């Protein structure tokens, strides 16, 4: 499995962050991740299609909001809190 690409903290752009948060589904993902330290994609999907959730997680990763790592066959997500402060 390919590792996920995450932009370095120095490359975070406010407009991308705000765009990522402008979608209600992505905002909900971020809010739920703020309540826990880490969660799998399945724990955050809310019954939505996997393809839609993959898109939303990619937008959040590209904006620098979320860190995703593979643990076996599960993708675990966490907020990049320190990079966003």
Stretches with model-predicted labels:
Residues 1, 57-61, 77-78:
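Short amphipathic alpha-helical surface micro-motifs
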Residues 1, 16, 52-54:
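Generic intrinsically disordered, low-complexity segments enriched for polar/acidic and small residues
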Residues 1-13:
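A detector for short, charged/polar N-terminal pre-domain segments
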Residues 6, 55-56, 75:
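Histidine (H) residue identity feature
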Residues 12-49, 71-83:
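N-terminal helix-turn-helix DNA-binding core of bacterial DNA-binding proteins
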Residues 42-68:
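Canonical helix-turn-helix DNA-binding module
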Residues 66-67, 83-85:
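Extended, hydrophobic interaction surfaces within ordered domains
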């Amino acid at each position: 499995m390919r590792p996920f690409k995450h932009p370095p903290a120095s490359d975070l752009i406010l407009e991308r962050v705000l765009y990522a948060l402008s979608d209600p589904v992505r905002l909900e993902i971020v809010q739920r991740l703020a309540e826990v330290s880490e969660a799998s994609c399945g724990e955050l999907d809310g019954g939505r299609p996997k393809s839609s959730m993959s898109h939303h997680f990619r937008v959040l990763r590209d904006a620098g909001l979320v860190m995703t790592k593979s643990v076996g066959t599960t993708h675990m997500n966490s907020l990049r809190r320190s990079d966003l402060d």
